[in-house]
Each structure stands twice: as structure tokens, then as C-alpha cells.
């Protein structure tokens, strides 16, 4: 097979791991920087060019689209879909998962456990937002934040109101969420491939930090997940329409609650923590499922 990996950085652990898994199985693999692609958008012969060369003959694409390039990266993925190339994660699913508010609304509609979340346009409803999530302490999140950035724990009501008004003064979109204190600064990252949880780890925030992201200095250990947590992760991936993703779950007093569904999860932390060949299992999944034109949206975006 000829497999393309859309990634801006060939040297990243995740990209390297996928390249090695492709090579080990005898596939032709190419790392493509999506920002260096440009497109001929035409009705009968859509194409993608890369430094003057047409990108042709690909059997599958693995999108590794960073949050900062979601718009252009998804346009490139969509173009591959229009050309009939199988994409592990479709453009519409990536876009859906990157919108925190839209994700929560879709998950809520299907009955997935979530932290109580409030959202408003105007600061005149700040007190109501705080009441909706049960008062302080509470969590305030920038909708555009990633890797734990733009996430603040407000310990008191006055602090919460000040932070909300400060963010709104910058015209930032924010979510206000209940603080799950019983999680004690930890979460569960479940990696889902093709509707199955293939690996999971517990991430613990560093001392004094409620954020468990490894990018923020957290640590990781192996964990045995419950059947309910497994079901929650699988259902969340399906609702988002993602063939490959990381589902972040908190253990609350009322069962598992989903914090995020990540369409481009890092492989380093979970592969090193669990000794599971995640990249290899993803390539195995592609081998079984890659067919020309096999997109749920049929390239319609």
C-alpha cells in the first residue's frame, strides 16, 4: 500500500512511529506537510500538488493535523477524500472534534457522561453560569485551547467572575465547567482504533496542578479501565465519527465523564507507558479497511 502521513514535523515521535510501522509491513510511506500542499479544486479531476508535483496513487491518508492548522489541514484532507483516498479520520470528523462546544453538544445528545458545562455570550450572565455548574471551585476553558493551555481552576466565586470577565474582555469564547474534585488531578486517556480501545493510561498532574496533560508536566501509569469506561470511550469515538482518537475520561462520583475527544492523539506517552504498539495496530486497521472512496461523507465535507 501507499500511505501518506499528513504531518508538519517528520521528527516527531508519533510521526516516526507510524513511518516505522508502515516500513515494517512493507508499505510505501510518505510524510507530507499539509501547509505545503496546494489544491486544484475542479469538478472532474481534483488534485493536490506538493512542490509542483501531483500527489497521486495513495491508498490511505493518516491525518496528524495540529490544532493551529485545523482549517487548512482539513481542507487538504477533504481534497484527498474528493480524490477517493481513504482517510483514517475524515475532515468533517476532525472539524467536529476540534470544536469543544460542538463536541460536548453532540456527546450530550447521545447521553455520554459529561461535566456540567455552561456557555454564554455576554458577561451579564456570569453569576448564572457559576450557579449552573454548582458554584466554585470551577474550571474555565478557552474554546481554542489545547494541551492544557487556556484552562484555569477558579477556587472562589469572585475569582471565577473576574477570570470570566477578563476572558470576555478579550472577546474570547469560554466554557465554564464543574470541577470534578474526586478525580484528584488525574484522568484516563483511552486510545480507540476502529471502535476498540487498544490502550489506556492514567495521567496524573504534577503536584499542585489539576491539569493532567503530559505537556504540562504530568506523569503516566498503566491502568485497567472498567467496562463502563471502555463503552464510554468507544461510543464517544463513534459519535465523533473518528476511526482513531484519544478519549479523555475523568472518574467522577457519578461514573465516567468525558473531557475531550482528541482526533490527533500523541503516541509517545501511551506507547512508552503501556508497551503497546499503537502505531502498528493503526496500520493493521488501515490494511483491513482502506478502500477507494470509503468515506462516510463521500468526500462531501
UniProtKB/Swiss-Prot annotation:
Cofactor note: Binds 2 magnesium or manganese ions per subunit.
Positions that bind Mn(2+) 1: 248, 260
Biological process terms in GO annotation: protein modification process; SOS response; translation
Binding residues annotated for Mg(2+) 2, in chain numbering: 260, 262
GO molecular function: ATP binding; metal ion binding; ribosomal S6-glutamic acid ligase activity
Binding positions for ATP per the UniProt entry: 141, 178-179, 187, 211-213
Keyword Manganese annotated: yes
Sequence positions that bind Mg(2+) 1: 248, 260
This protein's GO CC annotations: cytoplasm
Entry-linked Pfam families: RimK, Rimk_N
Residue span(s) of domain ATP-grasp: 104-287
Gene3D superfamilies given in the database record: 3.40.50.20, ATP-grasp fold, A domain (3.30.1490.20), ATP-grasp fold, B domain (3.30.470.20)
Chain positions recorded as Mn(2+) 2 binding sites: 260, 262
Entry's EC annotation: 6.3.2.-
Family per similarity comment: Belongs to the RimK family.
Name the UniProt record assigns to this protein: Probable alpha-L-glutamate ligase
Highest classification ranks of the organism: Bacteria, Pseudomonadati, Thermodesulfobacteriota, Desulfovibrionia, Desulfovibrionales
Amino acid at each position: 500500500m501507499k500511505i501518506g502521513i499528513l504531518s508538519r514535523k517528520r521528527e516527531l515521535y508519533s510521526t516516526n512511529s507510524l513511518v516505522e510501522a508502515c516500513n515494517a509491513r512493507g508499505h510505501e510511506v510518505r510524510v507530507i506537510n499539509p501547509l505545503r500542499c496546494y489544491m486544484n479544486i475542479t469538478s472532474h479531476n481534483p488534485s493536490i500538488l506538493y512542490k509542483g508535483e501531483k500527489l497521486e496513487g495513495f491508498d490511505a491518508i493518516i491525518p496528524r493535523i495540529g490544532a493551529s492548522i485545523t482549517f487548512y489541514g482539513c481542507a487538504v484532507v477533504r481534497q484527498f477524500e474528493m480524490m477517493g483516498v481513504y482517510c483514517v479520520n475524515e475532515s468533517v470528523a476532525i472539524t467536529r472534534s476540534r470544536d469543544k462546544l460542538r463536541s460536548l453538544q453532540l456527546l450530550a445528545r447521545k447521553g455520554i457522561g459529561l461535566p456540567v458545562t455552561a456557555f454564554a455570550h455576554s458577561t451579564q450572565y456570569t453569576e448564572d453560569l457559576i450557579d449552573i455548574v454548582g458554584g466554585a471551585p470551577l474550571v474555565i476553558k478557552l474554546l481554542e485551547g489545547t494541551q492544557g493551555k487556556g484552562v484555569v481552576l477558579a477556587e472562589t466565586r469572585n475569582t471565577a467572575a473576574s477570570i470570566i470577565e477578563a476572558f470576555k474582555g478579550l472577546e474570547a469564547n469560554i466554557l465554564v465547567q464543574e470541577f470534578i474534585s474526586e478525580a484528584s488531578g488525574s484522568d484516563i486517556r483511552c486510545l480507540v482504533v476502529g471502535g476498540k480501545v487498544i490502550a489506556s493510561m492514567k495521567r496524573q498532574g504534577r503536584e499542585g496542578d489539576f491539569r493532567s496533560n503530559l505537556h504540562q508536566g504530568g506523569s503516566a501509569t498503566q491502568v485497567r479501565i472498567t467496562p463502563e469506561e471502555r463503552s464510554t470511550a468507544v461510543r464517544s469515538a463513534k459519535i465523533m465519527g473518528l476511526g482513531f482518537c484519544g478519549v479523555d475520561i475523568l472518574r467522577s462520583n457519578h461514573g465516567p465523564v468525558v473531557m475531550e475527544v482528541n482526533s490527533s492523539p500523541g503516541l509517545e506517552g501511551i506507547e512508552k507507558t503501556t508497551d503497546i504498539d499503537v502505531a502498528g495496530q493503526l496500520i493493521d486497521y488501515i490494511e483491513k479497511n482502506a478502500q477507494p472512496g470509503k468515506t462516510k461523507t463521500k468526500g462531501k465535507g
